[in-house]
Amino acid sequence: MPYYDFFWIPETETHIEEHGVSREDFENAVCDPITTDYSRSTGDPACKGLALDGRLLFCVYRFLDEMTVEPVTAYEIED
């Protein structure tokens, strides 16, 4: 399981919370992904992973460096 530092911008945190995803949910999904991919709309790295309560999330992020992730968006998806 990789470890990352997360660089949270307040607007991004508000944006993902509007989708029902907390910081902790996002970080859990990104640090322990089920699959990794890329966003079709932006080409940014993305993953499918689990929220702390078991919901399946799709998370999009950017690498600022090898260890630092900037969240972009996240939302719940169906299997």
Residue ranges and their predicted role:
Residues 1-79:
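Ribonuclease/tRNase effector modules and their secretory precursors
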